[in-house]
Amino acid sequence: MEKLYESMYQLIVETSTKLPKDVRRAILKAKQRENAGTRAAMSLATITENIKMADENVSPICQDTGLPTFKIKVPVGINQIQIKETIKKAIAQATKDGKLRPNSVDSLTGENSGDNLGEGLPVVKFEQWEKDYMDVRLILKGGGCENKNIQYSLPCELEGLGRAGRDLDGIRKCILHAVYQAQGQGCSAGFIGVGIGGDRSAGYDLAKEQLFREVDDVNPNEELRQLEEYIMENANKLGIGTMGFGGETTLLGCKVGAMHRIPASFFVSVAYNCWAFRRLGVHIDPNTGEIIKWLYQDGEDVDFQENAAQEEHLASTDSERRVITLQAPITEEQIRELKVGDVVRINGIIYTGRDAIHKYLMDHDAPVDLNGQIIYHCGPVMLKDENGNWEVKAAGPTTSIREEPYQGDIMKKFGIRAVMGKGGMGQKTLQALKEHGGVYLNAIGGAAQYYADCIEAVEGVDLLEFGIPEAMWHLRVKDFTAVVTMDSHGNSLHEDIEKSSLEKLSQFKEPVFS
């Protein structure tokens, strides 16, 4: 199979940089449902612009290229060891070329391998079948949405919905609750795969397997088809919306599978995937390794360009939204003037900082003066050019809630005035913003090309020993846009949306399926 390496490399690059047609159709449909001038409409306009930029730049749609998971069906007699080794080489090369972010971290030492290889990685699952070609599918599922996966053991009590029993209606309640609990932290609007039955590990495997189905397919099981349709209709009544900003579309796809279980266990497992649903597949000639056919590419191309001029006009004339320009160092007085809903455009220097940096700063001095500065929750994709200078390939926000134990203390300790990420933060941070005079800025999750385009230069880097995603990058930006979703007056859009969506969730308490 002399062409297999080339085919696997192409599959990896295409999966990271180009959304499949079925996903694009779902996003376009969501865009058409939103009311013009809303935060959700603005977010979807940014998302579709980002998709176009990733196409043109052949660069990652989202900087978090996730944990590569391959599902492969092969004819009897094919050398699976050879296939796996070829995939590893292609993964390492794609990482070196900036198509994947180095995401493989030793769980004990915290060391990043730098090439997306390591114990158990990438995940490659084989299955034999009696066909004369190979079926290779790849999903790149980022950490933000992976962390919103959830598993229920029935019977159980669910917030807003009451008791969920061991029946189809209990399953219905679990799925609705799974969408509710994700809020905007998994980069909604999202896609979910649901696995009913099995043990804990098999249930999650089944849930993730559903994500390999076409978005617009029809479940052959009549009960599950009805359940999928019900969830799609009613989950979108929760009002969580794109990025958790509120809106008409919270869920873009729901696929449910079922398997047998043992009498003592009844699990409902939900795999949540962000809007940047990066999964593709190919059929491979087992003799040559060449690609015979691409999967998930049926139907017409989706053109997001048609309404671009209208969106730009609406964005520039929306009288309900204040747009404020900020440049660090920022004063407390400037921060106190900001309120939830304001759109901020940042110029000047921002500093990235995520899990390793926040843990480090609790016990160490900062490598730079952070007084009045902006911390960006981001693990970018970076490459060195031929002159040895760092170049930003992708730079969207990461999920901020992971920094909740540290954020308020660090802001006060170093005088930080703004933190930027996605999905919002909790009560401890909100209280610190109020006491200290700070704001939380929500950037559009997954919009890695859109934000990379706002970065004019990499001015420096500290703590690179933590690995590229976890280092502190000094980025000079221009017109870097985000929304104030938590202000210094105790207001939180995330808290408001969570409260209102819980009220809406409780409307679905009564039985539907007998």
Curated annotation (Swiss-Prot):
UniProt GO BP: tricarboxylic acid cycle
Cofactor note: Binds 1 [4Fe-4S] cluster per subunit.
GO molecular function: 4 iron, 4 sulfur cluster binding; fumarate hydratase activity; metal ion binding
Entry superkingdom: Bacteria
Catalytic activity, as annotated: (S)-malate = fumarate + H2O
Family classification: Belongs to the class-I fumarase family.
Protein name stated in the entry: Putative fumarate hydratase class I
Phylogenetic classification of the source organism: Bacteria, Bacillati, Bacillota, Bacilli, Bacillales
